[in-house]
Amino acid sequence: MVHLTPDEKNAVCALWGKVNVEEVGGEALGRLLVVYPWTQRFFDSFGDLSSPSAVMGNPKVKAHGKKVLSAFSEGLNHLDNLKGTFAKLSELHCDKLHVDPENFRLLGNVLVVVLAHHFGKDFTPEVQAAYQKVVAGVATALAHKYH
């Protein structure tokens, strides 16, 4: 559960309505793989991840980034029940994929950077604070199965 004020919730939803999920998702996942290269080990089947340009141009990275951000988008519709919304993904990432749950926090922070890059002045400190709450809540929900 994420506790947002009505103003924070409005800010998150207003900005999210402008997000190109495919573009932002691909960039966010790509940046995660470049900035934190140890996360690449979960994406062996994605082909060439040998350089930042290879990662950022990789169609499988872009496609999976879109998939990740689509799930995040669904979570925005259920801020009062993030654990329930992400229960199956938490189980998958814990039991089958064995992803370090810290990676969820890292991806959330990278997403905030990408949103700031894309929205510039519209991504005010207040909007950032609201998004930090949301990505922290999503990361906690995705890590729930690990506890």
From Swiss-Prot:
Residues given in the record as heme b binding sites: 64, 93
Phosphoserine modifications at: 51
One matching Pfam family: Globin
A GO molecular-function annotation: organic acid binding
InterPro entries in the record: Globin (IPR000971), Globin-like_sf (IPR009050), Globin/Proto (IPR012292), Hemoglobin_b (IPR002337), Hemoglobin_oxygen_transport (IPR050056)
Coiled-coil annotated spans: none
Keyword annotations: Heme, Iron, Metal-binding, Oxygen transport, Phosphoprotein, Transport
GO cellular component, one term: hemoglobin complex
BP-aspect Gene Ontology terms: hydrogen peroxide catabolic process
Boundaries of every Globin domain copy: 3-147
Tissue: Red blood cells.
Subunit text: Heterotetramer of two delta chains and two alpha chains.
Stated family: Belongs to the globin family.
Protein name (record): Hemoglobin subunit delta
Organism: Otolemur crassicaudatus
Gene that encodes the chain: HBD
